[in-house]
Amino acid sequence: MHGRLKVKTSEEQAEAKRLEREQKLKLYQSATQAVFQKRQAGELDESVLELTSQILGANPDFATLWNCRREVLQHLETEKSPEESAALVKAELGFLESCLRVNPKSYGTWHHRCWLLSRLPEPNWARELELCARFLEADERNFHCWDYRRFVAAQAAVAPAEELAFTDSLITRNFSNYSSWHYRSCLLPQLHPQPDSGPQGRLPENVLLKELELVQNAFFTDPNDQSAWFYHRWLLGRAEPHDVLCCVHVSREEACLSVCFSRPLTVGSRMGTLLLMVDEAPLSVEWRTPDGRNRPSHVWLCDLPAASLNDQLPQHTFRVIWTGSDSQKECVLLKDRPECWCRDSATDEQLFRCELSVEKSTVLQSELESCKELQELEPENKWCLLTIILLMRALDPLLYEKETLQYFSTLKAVDPMRAAYLDDLRSKFLLENSVLKMEYADVRVLHLAHKDLTVLCHLEQLLLVTHLDLSHNRLRALPPALAALRCLEVLQASDNALENVDGVANLPRLQELLLCNNRLQQSAAIQPLVSCPRLVLLNLQGNSLCQEEGIQERLAEMLPSVSSILT
C-alpha cells in the first residue's frame, strides 16, 4: 500500500466540496458585508475596489457592486492626478476583460465598460473593436458583445461600409450567424438610403440582387440553417406603405363621409390631421373611428351637416387632405345620387407587393427554380418550402395561386407544429388574391366561401363592398376591423365556427345577416347587432342558442327593428 495515491471515496469528495462551498460562501458574505459597510460610511477608497474585485472576479453579475465601483471611481477622479486616474482606468479595463473571460455574457460587465469608455477623453476605440472581434470569434452569438460593438462603432463613427465588411468576414467563416445577418440588415439601408423610405426601406436593385446571390449561397450550403432563410425573407419584404388616403366615400342618406388610409393612423395626433373642404370652403368636423375609440385605425368618419348635402346645387365637391403627407382625394356628389367615392385604381404591386423590374423578376424566377431543385433534394425542408411560396407571391400571386396552395399543403404536412400559423398565412394570401380579382372586375361583391379561411385581414380594402360571402370556412371570430365595411348590406357567415358576433357592430347599412350552423350558444352573443340600425333579416338556424326556451321572444325584444329572425 506504500507509495500508492490514496483515492477519496465519493462521500469524502462530496464532504470536501461542501466544506469548500461553505468557505467560499463565508468569504463572499464577509466581503459583501464589508463593501456595504464602507459604502454606507462614505469610505469610497481603493479598498472597496479590491473587495468588489474579489467578488465580481468570480461572479460578474452582481449589479449593485458595479454601482459601488462606479461611485468609487468617480470619487477617486477628484482626488488623483490625471496620470494616476489614467492608470486606474487602465487597470479597470484589464479587470473588466478578466470578468468577461469568466462570463462573456455578463450584462453588468459590458454596461460598466460602456460607462467607463464614455468618461474617457480619448478612448482607444480601435482596441475596443479588436476586443469585440476576439469575443465574437469565440462566440458569434454573443448578443451582449454585438450590442457593445454597435455602441463602439457609433462612438468611433466607424463607417457602415467597414462594419459591413466585418459581417462579410464572419458570414464567410460561418453562414450560420444570425447576428451577422441581422447587423447586415441594419447597415445596408444606412449605406444605401432611398428617398421616401424609412430605416427598413427597400434597397437599390443592384445591391438587392447582390445580396440575393450571397444569401442563396448560404442556404444552399446549409439548407437547414434558418439564419440565411430569415435574411432572405427580409430581402423579399417591402417598405412600409406611405401615409396616403386610399379612398373617400360620401353617403347622402347617412350624412357621413368615410376615409380609408394605407395603414392605421390616429387623426389629430402629431402624425397629422384631416382637413375637409366642401365646395372649396373649409368645413370643421369631428373625426371618429367606426367603433368610437380614439386609437389608430384604417378608417375614420365624420358627420356632414345638411347644408353640405342639399339638392339646391347640381353637385357638391368634397376634398379631403391628410396633412401628414399632403395626400388628398376629391369626389363629387351629383344631385339625386345617394353616394359618391374616389379611389385609386389599385394593382397587386400597389396593394400587396413591390413592383418588379425585368432584371429583378429574372433573378427571382431563377431563385424560384433553384429552390424547387433544392426542394427535390430536401423534400422536408420547411424553410425551402416557405421561401418557394414567398417567391411566388413576389413574382405573381394570381399566376401562382394554385401552385402556392399545393405548397402550403406540403408545408403543413412537413411542419405540423406550425399548422395554425400556416393556415392564417394561407388565408391572408387567399384574401389578397380575392381583393385583386375584385379590383380587376370592378365589382362591389366579394365571394370568399369554401376557401378554408381561418382569419380575415385587409378589411380596410373592402370599404365599398356591399355583399360579402364568408360561408363554409373555419372562422372562429369576426374581427372588429369589419366595421370598416361602411357600405356592407349583406353578410353571409354560415357554416363557420363563430362563438360570438362582436365584430359585427356599427355597420350602418347591414340589412341581412346569415349565421347558420355556427357555435353561438347564448342569446347574449347577439347583443352587438343592436348597433346595426338597418338589420331586417337574421338567420341563426343550426346554432345551440336556438334550443333556449323563449329564444324567439328574447331576440325580438333585443332586436325590435329586425322583422325576420329565423331560429
UniProtKB/Swiss-Prot annotation:
Tissue distribution: Most abundant in the heart, brain, spleen and liver. Less in the lung, muscle, kidney and testis; in these tissues less abundant than the beta subunit.
The PFTA repeats are found at: 44-78, 88-122, 124-158, 159-193, 207-241, 363-397
Keywords assigned by UniProt?
Leucine-rich repeat, Phosphoprotein, Prenyltransferase, Repeat, Transferase
**Quick check: keyword Phosphoprotein in the entry?**
yes
What SUPFAM superfamilies does this protein map onto?
A: L domain-like (SSF52058), Protein prenylyltransferase (SSF48439), Rab geranylgeranyltransferase alpha-subunit, insert domain (SSF49594)
List GO molecular-function terms, semicolon-separated: Rab geranylgeranyltransferase activity; small GTPase binding; zinc ion binding
Q: Which family does it belong to?
A: Belongs to the protein prenyltransferase subunit alpha family.
Name the record gives this protein: Geranylgeranyl transferase type-2 subunit alpha
Gene symbol of the encoding locus: Rabggta
